[in-house]
Amino acid sequence: APSLVGSEMCIRDRPLIHLDTSHSLEEGTEMSRLNCRDPDAAVRMGKSLRKIRREKDSIGSVVELLILGLPIGVGEPWFDGLEPSLARALMAIPGARAIEFSNGIEASRMRGSENNDMWAPGDVAPELEGAKTGDADGALGGRSTGAPLRVLVHFKPPSSLPREQFTLHLPSNKKQSLKVGGRHDPVIGPRAAPVVEAVAM
């Protein structure tokens, strides 16, 4: 049966498939607070977010989703394919601005010989070389390949800031100062991670 390894905040240098996902994140740690499995990245992100909060600003974020155990052939070609269906659902999450599958944007900078996944004989069924290391594409042509399906969901910075901004006051048709009160999250990603996971299920 397919398993959802989870969705976590990520920094691109260490994909989720290369991290230990066998246990829950320890409560009260930076890793738990930020939904980040990479201990080094969690420390760096924590420092960055404290700085952003002091500056009364916000920052964009990326949530990584990893789905394991999909058999070959799940999905449909064209509009009902695995990637279009997931992208449509994930883009409905407030603040989502872009979706990447597998190599994502990086694939646009590659040659076909670099990006193509090679099929090889497997124990039960054919498998893509690189499936175990996370280098193979989890979906091709709208259908699953049997390899892990890696999805990156990019979120914009939260727009409500505790610093002064300007907006148009419609009745007067003039720019006016706007300062939003209350509590402000400087980033969407940590709270969006469980939402990304729920949408993918």
Predicted regions and their residues:
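Single conserved hydrophobic/aromatic residue that forms the stacking wall/gate
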Residues: 1-6
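Catalytic-loop motifs flanking and including active-site residues across diverse enzymes
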Residues: 7, 86, 144-147, 194-196, ...
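Internal helix-turn-beta structural module
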Residues: 160-201
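Long, well-ordered alpha-helical segments
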Residues: 7-15, 157-164, 201
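Short, mixed-charge aromatic SLiMs
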Residues: 15-24, 112-115, 173-178
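Glycine-rich, mobile lid/loop segments that gate access to catalytic sites or pores
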Residues: 7-78
